Amino acid sequence: MEAIIEVESNGNKHAKNGNQIGVMQITPILVADCNEILKQRKSAKRFKLSDRFSVAKSKEMFLLIQSWYNPHNNVEKAIRLWNGGVNYKIKSTQRYYEKVMRAMK
């Protein structure tokens, strides 16, 4: 997760690129996806768009997405999923995957 943060924003919680915000460059669609997962799990908790500026809440959203779509904690899948979404393509996430792997070393 720290390598993804480094690649996404270099640790800047105020980073903004279009509708991607925070250390993990979270989009409004991802916040909505997290809230849908919480709803399916019958949790009363919900994330707000402003939570993207919080490092802790951004990490929570990352872990929630991974627990739902990557329950076996496959590192490669985690990286590609974060970059390309649920229906990621290997080819279109390859450069990002390599960048994160370099940041992990």
Predicted regions span which residues?
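Catalytic glycan-binding domains that act on GlcNAc-containing polysaccharides
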Residues: M1-K105
